[in-house]
C-alpha cells in the first residue's frame, strides 16, 4: 500500500470507516493473517489484521483497561491469569499493573504478530514482555485450554472477530476448555463485537457460554475505532456474586491496587454492566 492513500476497513459490506495512510511501517501476509501497521495523524499507529482494525495508539487504552481491570478487580485475588491472543502486548501491559498476580500466560497462535508488535507497537506493550511473571505460548487457543494442566483465576480472550483464525475462539469447544482450566470462582471475559451491528455474535456467545457457566452476561465500553457503537464484552463465571459487587468493594480494591487509569474507574465498572434494551430483548427472545 502506498503512502498518502486511504485504507478502508472491510468488516462490513455496505458501510465502514477509512484512515488516511501517512506512512506504512509494516505490511506482510503471514501463515495465518494479513498484517499491516501504518501511521495516521489522528490515531497514531494503526494495526489491522485481514482488513479489520485491531488497535490504534489513540484509543487502545479503553479496550485494554476494560478487558483487564473489570475481571481482575471483580475477582479480587487473582493470582494466575491467562490471555488468549493479545499479541500486541497491551493486555499484558495492563495485567502486569496488578502486583498480586503471580503468573501471566499468553497464548498466541501467530509468533509473527508478537515479534511485529514488539518492534512496531512499543507503546502498547511498554516493556511488559520482559516481566518475569510472563510466559508466551505459541499455540492454538482451543488446543491450549483443552490440553493444559495449568489452572487460572481469570481468562481474557483477546480474540479477533469470528472469521478466519479467530473463529475457533467463539466455539463451544473453546468455552468448555476455558471452564475446564478456570479455578473455582474464576472469571472468563472476551471481546464480543459491536452489538448494534453484530448482535448475532453476542447471542451466540451467550447461548454457548450458558452451557458451562451459571452467570453469563455482558459489559460495554465506547471505543471510537471499533466502528458502529458500543463495544460488547462477554462475561462468564460460576460465582454469581462477582458481577454485583458494591461500588465500595470495587473502590477499595481499585485504591489498594494503586491503579491510575485513563478510562476505567469504579463508577465505570458498575455502569458498564447496564445494557441497552434491544440487547435485553434479544437475549430474552432466544
Swiss-Prot record:
Keyword list, A-Z: Cytoplasm, Polyamine biosynthesis, Spermidine biosynthesis, Transferase
UniProt-annotated binding residues for S-methyl-5'-thioadenosine: 33, 108, 140-141, 165
Single GO MF descriptor: spermidine synthase activity
Superkingdom of origin organism: Bacteria
Any one of the GO CC terms: cytosol
Active site positions, chain numbering: 158
Catalytic activity, as annotated: S-adenosyl 3-(methylsulfanyl)propylamine + putrescine = S-methyl-5'-thioadenosine + spermidine + H(+)
The protein's annotated pathway: Amine and polyamine biosynthesis; spermidine biosynthesis; spermidine from putrescine: step 1/1
Localization in the cell: Cytoplasm
InterPro entries hit by this protein: PABS, PABS_CS, SAM-dependent_MTases_sf, Spermi_synthase, Spermidine_synt_N, Spermidine_synt_N_sf
Gene Ontology biological process terms from the UniProt entry: spermidine biosynthetic process
Oligomer and partners: Homodimer or homotetramer.
Family from the record: Belongs to the spermidine/spermine synthase family.
Name this protein carries in UniProt: Polyamine aminopropyltransferase
Amino acid at each position: 500500500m502506498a503512502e498518502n492513500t486511504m485504507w478502508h476497513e472491510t468488516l462490513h459490506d455496505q458501510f465502514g470507516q477509512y484512515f488516511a495512510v501517512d506512512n506504512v511501517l509494516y505490511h506482510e501476509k503471514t501463515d495465518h493473517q494479513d498484517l499491516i501497521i501504518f501511521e495516521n495523524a489522528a490515531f497514531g499507529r494503526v494495526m489491522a489484521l485481514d482488513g479489520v482494525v485491531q488497535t490504534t495508539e489513540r484509543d487502545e487504552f479503553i479496550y485494554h483497561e476494560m478487558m483487564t481491570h473489570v475481571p481482575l478487580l471483580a475477582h479480587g485475588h487473582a493470582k494466575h491469569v491467562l490471555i488468549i491472543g493479545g499479541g500486541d502486548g497491551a493486555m499484558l501491559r495492563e495485567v502486569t499493573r496488578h502486583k498480586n498476580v503471580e503468573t501471566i500466560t499468553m497464548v498466541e497462535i501467530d509468533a509473527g504478530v508478537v515479534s511485529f508488535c514488539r518492534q512496531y507497537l512499543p507503546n502498547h506493550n511498554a516493556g511488559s514482555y520482559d516481566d518475569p511473571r510472563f510466559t508466551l505460548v505459541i499455540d492454538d487457543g482451543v488446543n491450549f485450554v483443552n490440553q493444559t494442566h495449568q489452572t487460572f483465576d481469570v481468562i481474557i480472550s483477546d480474540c479477533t472477530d469470528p472469521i478466519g483464525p479467530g473463529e475457533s475462539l467463539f466455539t463451544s469447544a473453546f468455552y468448555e476448555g476455558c471452564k475446564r482450566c478456570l479455578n473455582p470462582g474464576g472469571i472468563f471475559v472476551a471481546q464480543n463485537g459491536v452489538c448494534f451491528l453484530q448482535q448475532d455474535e453476542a447471542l451466540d456467545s451467550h447461548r454457548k457460554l450458558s452451557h458451562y457457566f451459571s452467570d453469563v452476561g455482558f459489559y460495554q465500553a465506547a471505543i471510537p475505532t471499533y466502528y458502529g457503537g458500543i463495544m460488547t464484552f462477554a462475561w462468564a463465571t460460576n460465582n454469581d456474586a462477582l458481577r454485583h459487587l458494591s461500588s465500595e468493594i470495587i473502590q477499595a480494591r481499585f485504591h489498594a491496587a494503586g491503579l491510575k487509569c485513563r478510562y476505567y474507574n469504579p463508577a465505570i465498572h458498575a455502569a458498564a454492566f447496564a445494557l441497552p434494551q434491544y440487547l435485553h430483548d434479544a437475549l430474552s427472545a432466544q
